[in-house]
Structures are given as C-alpha cells and as structure tokens.
C-alpha cells in the first residue's frame, strides 16, 4: 500500500507538471483505487485533462467512461466523439468501437459504410474480429460492393490467427473456388484446421461431403 501511495503521488506530481501519461495514470489510479481512495468521478476528470491535451490513451478512456456511464453520465454520442479522436490517432480498439457504434447506430445514425471503413482500418492492424467483419461485409455486399476475392482474403487473414470459423470459411472458398483459384487439397487442410479445434459446423460439412473429420 505504501508503494502504491508513493507511485500515485509521483504520478500526481508529474501530472501537475504537465505530463500527459501521468495524467492518464492518475485516472487509472482513481479508477482502480491504487494508492488513492477509489473515485470514478476523479478518474474521469484526470482522463479528460489528458484527453483534451491529446493523449491517445486518455481519449480512449474518456470514451469508455461515457460509453459505460462510469464517473460521468452515460452519453453514446460523446463516447463516439472520443473514440473517433483516438481512432484517428491510430488506437485499434477505438477504431473497433467506432465501427461498432456506426454499425449499431449508437450515438449516431446507423451507417454501415463508415462501420466498414473503421473495421477495415482495425483489420489492417491485425484485429481478428474486424478481419472477420470485413470479410463478411465483402461477402454480403454490406456497406461495400460485394467482392468474393476480398471476402476470401480477409477470412484467410483471420484464419491464420487461429479462428476456427474463419478457417472453415477459408477452406470452403478454396474447395469451391469462390474468390480464389480452386484448390481442394488446400481447402481441406483449412477445414481440418477448424475441425481440430472442435468446430462443429466444419465437422458436419466433412460428414455431409464424404471427407474424414481429421
């Protein structure tokens, strides 16, 4: 406890001297009750100090506070405002959250084109669920022109990260030659990667089409 108090005091001094990271860290201290009495209103205030001065992590934290109603009244519109600021600065989770907001119409009008644009940015940074979302967008032509080759590409990116549903989808693309050059051997390898993880849909597909499950 003494060490935590010393750390919090150090952050406070640095924050008062204008250190943005320390301001954000003070917010974390108050949010978690680390070295100080837990106070979510104070946490929000420290996050906001740093966010208004441009700290990317604080921008995300302010957005989270508004989204959750944590230390401040819940406000989806203001949450999106701060997610977008952090997203423009390159924060991947903020890009994802902004996409989700546009997709669901939280704090803004529903806009699947903007949702796709932000998921794409996150996908390009390696965010797995965003890669799947972008693949689905291209497959369904939702918010973007339908493009089987891009759908296959993004599902394969997600599959390479170990997602069994994406692995099965990638296998199906290769088995059927949809969006890629047909390669049944490669396709079956992908499907077996999914079955090895217990993905039931892939197992059933193998049974239905006369292939071994493993």
Predicted regions and their residues:
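Terminal, low-structured helical/coil segments at or just beyond the last alpha-helical repeat
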Residues: 2, 193-214
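Short helix-capping/linker turns of helical repeat alpha-solenoids
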Residues: 16-19, 32-34, 39, 52-56, ...
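TPR/TPR-like (Sel1-like) alpha-helical repeat modules
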Residues: 153, 181-200
